[in-house]
């Protein structure tokens, strides 16, 4: 894949034009290599040469988690000899779905988190304490480890759990940044308080948080985020949103007004129950098309996650789409007096 980190600071029109160029490459690749999408294009009489604009994606059916579950192997676009890494994610029908990554896909994954780190203001002067696993077929820990290497940060692979080991590492090596599931920070705070550790005076300045929301739809800290902030006000908390399927992430900048799209890596749509785009200010299902993926690219994949989106320029200088915190999963939302 080609790297273009400056594209996020271009005008919305330039970003859209760039993405449409990458979309054409993705469609050509899918038609040549994906059994699933070859079948879809044939059954629905889709001429990929007519898909020129992001709006034209509406001519193509969506892909669902059930499709992945039932036709897992048909999504694989490369020979087994090209597969370097295997990861899994939960499926809708019980069994996990396997995702395969090539060497190029791992480079893309590394670049994804390089962008995430730079979005939060990290640099090669920082030291990262990795507080999640990089094994057990888990993508995120490996992605952040590789992204930190690409940025040039020092990395301490502590893994998840064991507050005593986490604090011993902080005391010995003085990391400045953590990558963590935010509820674990509560356990770190509790351990520090019981053992007379002044956590607000330690070296840790910020944490990039995965797996759990920290803010509400107004970008204010939610109950979990506020609980951490009240006890550890010196620590900056950055929310993220990601999934194995997209092999990418949305990350907050220092304005804390939503997670930024990485336009080199995915196209995102927000769809209603009829798979039509929702207007800004309306909740929609996050639907993604991967760009630059070799092993298992996805086209109009519905994640099941419902959120709001924002398109106005961010004060950080980026002009990318931003996501709110996830409202919930499709099928778990309820209606009350016309409001989701």
Predicted regions and their residues:
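Glycine-rich, often proline-containing surface loops adjacent to acidic residues and nearby aromatics
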Residues: 92, 127, 205
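Nucleotide 5′-phosphate-binding alpha/beta core
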Residues: 1-88, 94-111, 115-119, 124, ...
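AMP-binding/adenylate-forming
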Residues: 103-118, 127-187
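Short aromatic/hydrophobic contact patches that present stacked aromatics
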Residues: 98, 129, 333-335
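Secondary-structure boundary/capping residues
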Residues: 39, 98, 122-125, 137, ...
């Amino acid at each position: 894949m080609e790297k273009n980190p400056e594209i996020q600071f271009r005008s919305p029109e330039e970003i859209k034009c760039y993405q449409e160029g990458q979309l054409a490459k993705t469609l050509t690749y899918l038609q040549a290599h994906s059994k699933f999408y070859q079948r879809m294009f044939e059954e629905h009489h889709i001429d990929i040469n007519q898909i020129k604009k992001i709006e034209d994606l509406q001519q193509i059916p969506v892909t669902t988690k059930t499709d992945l579950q039932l036709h897992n192997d048909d999504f694989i676009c490369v020979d087994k000899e090209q597969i370097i890494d295997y990861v899994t994610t939960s499926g809708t029908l019980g069994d996990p779905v396997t995702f395969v990554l090539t060497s190029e896909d791992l480079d893309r994954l590394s670049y994804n988190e390089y962008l995430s780190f730079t979005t939060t203001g990290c640099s090669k002067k920082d030291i990262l304490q990795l507080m999640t696993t990089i094994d057990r077929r888990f993508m995120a820990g490996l992605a952040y480890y590789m992204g930190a290497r690409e940025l040039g940060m020092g990395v301490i692979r502590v893994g998840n759990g064991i507050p005593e080991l986490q604090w011993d590492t902080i005391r010995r090596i003085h990391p400045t940044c953590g990558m963590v599931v935010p509820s674990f920070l509560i356990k770190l705070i509790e351990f520090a308080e019981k053992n007379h550790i002044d956590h607000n005076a330690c070296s840790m300045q910020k944490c990039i948080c995965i797996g759990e929301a920290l803010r509400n739809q107004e970008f204010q800290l939610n109950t979990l985020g506020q609980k951490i902030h009240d006890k550890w006000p010196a620590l900056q908390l950055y929310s993220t949103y990601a999934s194995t399927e997209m092999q990418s992430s949305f990350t907050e900048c220092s304005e804390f007004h939503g997670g930024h799209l990485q336009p080199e890596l995915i196209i995102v749509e927000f769809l209603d129950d009829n798979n039509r785009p929702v207007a800004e200010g309306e909740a929609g299902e996050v639907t993604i098309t991967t760009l630059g993926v070799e092993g298992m690219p996805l086209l109009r994949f519905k994640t099941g996650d419902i959120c709001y989106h924002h398109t106005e320029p961010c004060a950080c200088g980026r002009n990318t789409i931003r996501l709110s915190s996830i409202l919930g999963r499709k099928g778990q939302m309820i209606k009350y007096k016309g409001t989701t």
